[in-house]
From Swiss-Prot:
This is Large ribosomal subunit protein uL13c. Pfam families: Ribosomal_L13. PANTHER family: LARGE RIBOSOMAL SUBUNIT PROTEIN UL13M, RIBOSOMAL PROTEIN L13. Belongs to the universal ribosomal protein uL13 family. The lineage of its organism: Eukaryota, Rhodophyta, Bangiophyceae, Bangiales, Bangiaceae. The gene is rpl13. It is found in: Plastid, Chloroplast.
Length: 142
């Protein structure tokens, strides 16, 4: 009888910087989610955290195609009766530009404990400056 061989965890994670300036939201989100899951590595395992850390800068300058700036809606609910809040892409981009990329990437990650763990490896900043210089991140060209 053969035993199931599980791959050894490669704990050396890399840090990548992605510039979101003038990038399309969906296309950059797929690159980010693939890096977070580790699909760009030969040691990818669907049920293990083999991904890397991702720093996204200039999230305030991400774009969407077509007329989605006015038509794409983001909904949230306070939990109270009548507490549904709806805002467009343009309104959310002026109020919280990081939230747009976070919501897009979170929808592409697996649901459950692994997805929540992978989501903590995503760092999004609206400007060109980030505080993760000590990790020596590599620039990732999209």
């Amino acid at each position: 009888m053969n035993k199931t061989q599980s791959p050894s965890l490669n704990t050396n994670s890399h840090w990548y910087v992605i510039d979101a300036k003038n990038q399309t939201l969906g296309r950059i989100s797929t690159h980010i989610s693939n890096i977070l899951r580790g699909k760009n590595k030969p040691s990818y395992t669907p049920y293990l955290d083999t991904g890397d850390y991702v720093i996204v800068i200039n999230s305030a300058h991400v774009s969407v195609s077509g007329n989605k700036t006015n038509q794409k809606l983001y909904r949230r609910h306070s939990g109270q009766p009548g507490g549904l809040k709806v805002e467009t892409f343009d309104q959310l981009q002026t109020r919280l530009p990081n939230r747009i990329i976070e919501k897009s990437v979170k929808g592409m990650l697996p649901k459950g404990p692994l997805g929540r763990k992978l989501f903590t490896k995503l760092k999004v900043y609206s400007g060109p400056i980030h505080p993760h210089v000590a990790q020596k991140p590599q620039e990732y060209i999209v």
